[in-house]
């Protein structure tokens, strides 16, 4: 009997934000993501962003009661072809890096901050 995967992909990953407008500006203008959904949701908005080459969406939304997550470390990694080139490009746009590119046995990584103080790994290899 053939079995199928019950879970087929990661639909979205949430990034907690305090100021949704400021976060949208950061992720679209500096990171190059595109807004695909922006609709009211309670006292906030449900904002989904797409990355050009990925089916997984990024959601800029903080569930009530989880504001303590804003400004924390995102346990995941954004993949790029060349960390050093991307680091130079994003640094020129004003993106703050807390760790410059570093080569490891498994590849290269750097850590940057978004407009809300959240930290993210960017990696290749």
List where the protein language model places each region:
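Helix N-cap motif at beta-to-alpha junctions
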Residues: 19-20, 80-83
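Short, charged/polar surface micro-motifs in flexible loops or helix N-caps
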Residues: 52-57, 65-67, 83-85
């Amino acid at each position: 009997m053939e079995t199928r995967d019950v879970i087929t992909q990661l639909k979205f990953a949430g990034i907690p934000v305090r100021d949704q407008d400021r976060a949208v500006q950061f992720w679209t203008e500096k990171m190059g993501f595109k807004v695909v959904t922006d609709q009211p949701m309670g006292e906030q908005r449900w904002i989904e962003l797409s990355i050009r080459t990925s089916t997984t969406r990024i959601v800029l939304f903080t569930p009530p009661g989880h504001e303590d997550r804003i400004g924390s470390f995102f346990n995941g990694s954004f993949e790029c072809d060349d960390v050093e080139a991307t680091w130079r490009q994003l640094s020129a746009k004003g993106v703050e890096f807390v760790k410059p590119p570093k080569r490891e046995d498994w590849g290269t990584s750097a850590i940057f901050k978004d407009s809300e103080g959240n930290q993210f790994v960017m990696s290749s290899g």
